[in-house]
């Protein structure tokens, strides 16, 4: 959420640095395998957004140390497995975790990609990483793909061939599958009420990002109202660690075997901040450091839009009211996409269409 609220990078740099710690690496971030992969992926996303190569030069040895730790604990197929001290988390959901987990492998695949891209940015040889990217994709498709279900199963060791949403969501977000398959995932998995629902604001963000990426903005807007809004209607003033709309009363507050063990102020629930800026206001960098960026608003159900979105080291202001769209920014390199047409955005000159 920090990068979605402020163009000041110092907080993000401090956060990334603190999460890596200092080598040697002896355990995953928070002991959670997924968080280690996500930190490496997030480091690339920070660089792509800011172009801050000096920070990448500084943090790369720590990223490489964490990456090497991840790789050292893979199995003979190059898959993430739970080693002593590990926590294969992904989400608080009914996932078959009895063996290697598909969603975890897709995160690893993207971490391989991120290391390749970071290494290339520093002028290094990315071959070892790109080879792992290709090899892992083949293994995932061989072991986790179920042609009859047209889905990635949670794991292949139990015989259950259980399908949850998580692998499909990551596959959509990281372009692990083509558009046709992604659309099938929406129809057969994400819109399928027989597939276990997500019950954390944390992972609900990823699901809504997948919907938005494929053009289903209204679904995401309705979910913001019903899911995050559901907590507010129950009296929440901050967002909870977990929320299951089917629960009632004090059951909402129980977690970790404790009747009142749930965090009711959890930063991982801040996903709408990103969703609204990225997909409704439609602001995104299209090249490293946001030297080029697009503004492609998608109001969906909203009649008006007013927002300021960080991009690069500055901001883009987007206002939609009474059918008039206005974009302002102190940056060069912007393009407005609106009603199928593209308009160059001039630095410091309001553009109204």
Model-predicted segments: where are they?
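Generic structural "secondary-structure junction" signal
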Residues: 7, 13, 18, 57, ...
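Catalytic cores of carbohydrate-active enzymes
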Residues: 12, 71-90, 97-257, 346
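Active-site catalytic pocket residues across diverse enzymes, especially alpha/beta-hydrolases
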Residues: 47, 211, 280
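Non-catalytic C-terminal accessory modules of carbohydrate-active enzymes
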Residues: 131, 218-353
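Short Gly/Pro-enriched turn/cap motifs at secondary-structure boundaries
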Residues: 29-30, 160-163, 264-267
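A generic structural signal for residues located within well-ordered alpha-helices
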Residues: 35, 166, 203, 268-271
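Short, surface-exposed helix-loop/turn micro-motifs enriched in polar/charged residues
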Residues: 55-58, 125, 199, 287
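Aromatic-rich carbohydrate-recognition surfaces in CAZymes
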Residues: 1-89, 97-115, 119
């Amino acid at each position: 959420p920090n990068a979605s609220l402020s163009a000041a990078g110092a907080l993000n740099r401090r956060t990334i640095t603190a999460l890596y710690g200092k080598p040697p690496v002896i355990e995953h971030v928070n002991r959670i395998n997924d968080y280690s992969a996500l930190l490496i992926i997030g480091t690339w996303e920070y660089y792509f957004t800011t172009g801050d190569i000096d920070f990448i030069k500084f943090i790369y040895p720590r990223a490489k140390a964490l990456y090497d730790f991840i790789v050292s604990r893979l199995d003979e197929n190059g898959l993430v497995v739970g080693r002593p001290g590990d926590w294969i988390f992904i989400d608080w959901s009914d996932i078959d975790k009895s063996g290697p987990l598909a969603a975890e492998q897709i995160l690893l695949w993207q971490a391989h990609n991120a290391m390749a891209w970071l290494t290339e940015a520093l002028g290094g040889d990315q071959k070892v990483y790109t080879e792992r990217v290709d090899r892992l994709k083949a293994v995932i498709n061989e072991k986790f793909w179920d042609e009859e279900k047209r889905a990635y199963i949670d794991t292949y060791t139990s015989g259950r061939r259980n399908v949850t949403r998580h692998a499909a969501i990551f596959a959509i977000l990281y372009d692990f599958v083509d558009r046709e398959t992604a659309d099938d995932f929406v129809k057969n998995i994400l819109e399928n009420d027989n597939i276990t629902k997500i019950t954390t604001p944390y992972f609900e963000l990823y699901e809504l990002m997948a919907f938005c990426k494929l053009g289903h903005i209204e679904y995401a807007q309705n979910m913001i109202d019903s899911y995050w809004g559901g907590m507010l209607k129950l009296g929440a003033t901050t967002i909870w660690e977990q929320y299951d709309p089917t629960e009632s009363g004090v059951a909402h507050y129980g977690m970790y075997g404790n009747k009142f063990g749930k965090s009711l102020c959890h930063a991982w629930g801040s996903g709408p901040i990103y969703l609204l800026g990225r997909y409704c206001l439609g602001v995104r960098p299209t090249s490293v450091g946001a030297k080029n960026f697009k503004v492609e608003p998608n109001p969906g159900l909203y009649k008006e839009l007013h927002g300021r979105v960080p991009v690069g080291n500055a901001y883009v202001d987007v206002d939609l009211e009474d059918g008039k769209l206005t974009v302002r920014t102190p940056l060069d390199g912007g393009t407005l996409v609106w009603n199928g047409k593209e308009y160059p955005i001039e630095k410091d000159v309001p553009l109204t269409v």
